[in-house]
Amino acid sequence: MAWPSPAKINLFLHITGRRGDGYHEIQTAFQFLDYSDSLEFQIQKSTTIELLTPLEGVKNESNLIIRAAKCLQAETNPQQGVMISIKKRLPIGGGLGGGSSNAATTLIALNHLWQTKLTTTELAQLGLTLGADVPVFIHGYAAWAEGVGEELTPILPAEPWYVVIVPNCQVSTTKVFSSQELTRDCEPITISRFLSGEGKNICEGVVLKSYPAVSEAVNWLNRYGQSRMSGTGACVFADFNSQIHAQQVLENLPDHWRGFIAKGCNQSPLATLMSLRN
């Protein structure tokens, strides 16, 4: 069985402060896309955990898929292992949450297959130890996020079609958040103000100065709609009212770029799958 590991986009991203431990306080809105990696799990009688399809440039010990499986195994002691394979579509370092999504899908799938019976809340708490974005993928609903990204409130933004461009570069989140040019004192806004159109990606200006490929993609997509960057990049997106319109824009994409169209989803494809199983 294939388990979806969907992309997310940040509809806006503000930094409202910095905590004493160095983590940034943020406000953002997450929405899922119907565009996913795909994971398969083969349960083993031994406790061995193995990734059959290693990702280029990512060491197994730092891969969030392996780390998530080992984390759940250590927490619940299922006396079983797993062999995992992945078909990768989401770009690494693209701001679409690929690694966090992979971790969440691994936790949810193995909680089911190992019959470890953790609740969604318990899985989300476990996921938070792997990354701030993992809990939103565990819960599986579009969300307003505060704190370091772990304080989630369900929201229901519009679900348009998106054109997503994948520039040929990987953006370092650490580099962006450590930049002296990054604004860290945005005025907090409310959900209603966001839903009425307020909010922007405060990281975008820093990224555009350092990554010409992202700047080029933003400028090109702005010819067709309001282009925005997801997370700390590198991917940029714009929304359109119909699949036909989005497809027409994608067909004009320069040959040296990669891109795709996807539907915005307020329930993740993984959450939809799990609701059908229950």
Placement of each model-derived feature along the sequence:
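ATP-binding N-lobe of GHMP and related small-molecule kinases
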Residues: 1-93, 112-121, 148, 166-167
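ATP-dependent small-molecule kinase catalytic core of the GHMP/sugar-kinase superfamily
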Residues: 2-4, 12-28, 116-225, 239-278
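Residue-level signal for inorganic ion chemistry
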Residues: 11, 39-41, 65, 99, ...
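A generic structural signal for alpha->beta connector loops
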Residues: 36, 48, 78-81, 159, ...
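Short, basic/glycine-rich phosphate-binding loops at helix/coil junctions
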Residues: 45-58, 106, 128, 193-201
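Short, active-site-adjacent cap segments at secondary-structure transitions
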Residues: 47, 91-92, 171, 235-237, ...
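A broadly conserved amphipathic alpha-helix scaffold signal in soluble, globular proteins
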Residues: 70, 105-111, 125-128
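Glycine/serine-rich anion-binding loops at beta->alpha junctions
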Residues: 85-114, 226-240
